[in-house]
A protein has these predicted regions:
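Short proline/glycine-enriched turn/loop motifs at strand-loop junctions of beta-rich domains
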Residues: 26-32
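Beta-strand signatures of extracellular beta-sandwich domains
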Residues: 34-36
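Structural beta-strand segments of beta-rich domains
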Residues: 19-23
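Catalytic domains of carbohydrate-active enzymes, especially glycoside hydrolases
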Residues: 183-193
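Conserved, mostly hydrophobic/aromatic
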Residues: 25, 78, 157, 188
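The feature marks proteins involved in alpha-glucan
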Residues: 1-18, 47-49, 57-62, 69-156, ...
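Short S/T/G- and acidic-enriched coil/turn segments that sit immediately N-terminal to beta-strands
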Residues: 61-64, 181
Length: 193
């Protein structure tokens, strides 16, 4: 079994190191994070689950770990635990989450968008991040936003779930569509997104 090391909070995403791979994800409101390692993009369950210790693997808003022996091409995802409050934080630990800083994505052949919402597990049909060498990644083809992380807000939503309900404030003919999301822009701006 590979050694589990403390890792570093920066850079975010996955980074190949001399000993293996460092993983780091921002999850400031989480009280627990698991790193899931998969053997293939179609794997219905992870080969390994690494439970990140809050004392060892958390620095401020960042959860991080270095796993010895891993290499480029490794597939991974996260489970994030925390409060589930109506109108507040929506942690759903049954969901495998894609790293927002992943440089590669696999799993499209098994991905089921409808399983991304609700409380049911999506482990067998989730997208997975791919560990890619930073120096091989074409940053010019995928430029970073020109604002600081302190000013960055990542707001994940499902178009249908966000706009389909009758109390969403979206016109019936636009519910469940990208046009419905346009109707919700003032709400998102009020949140600071």
């Amino acid at each position: 079994m590979s050694a589990i090391l403390r890792g570093k909070p920066w850079p975010l995403g996955s980074t190949v190191t001399a000993r293996g791979v460092n993983f780091s994800v921002a999850a400031p409101r989480a009280n627990r994070v698991e790193l899931l390692l998969f053997s293939s993009s179609e794997a219905p369950s992870p080969d390994r689950i690494i439970d990140l210790d809050v004392q060892t693997h958390r620095s401020g808003d960042y959860w991080h770990v270095e796993v010895e022996g891993l290499k480029e091409g490794c597939l991974y995802g996260y489970r994030v635990f925390g409060p589930l409050a109506p109108g507040g934080h929506g942690f759903r630990p049954a969901k495998v989450l894609l790293d927002p800083c992943a440089r590669g994505i696999e799993g499209w052949s098994v991905y089921q968008r409808e399983m991304a919402t609700g409380a049911s597990p999506n482990t067998d049909c989730c997208l997975k991040g791919v560990v890619c060498e930073r120096d091989r990644f074409d940053f010019d083809a995928h430029p970073r936003p020109r604002h600081s992380w302190q000013q960055t807000v990542i707001y994940e939503l499902h178009v249908g779930g966000f706009t389909r309900r009758s109390d969403s404030g979206v016109a019936p003919e636009r519910r469940g569509t990208l046009l419905g999301v346009i109707d919700k822009i003032p709400y998102l701006k009020d949140l600071g997104v």
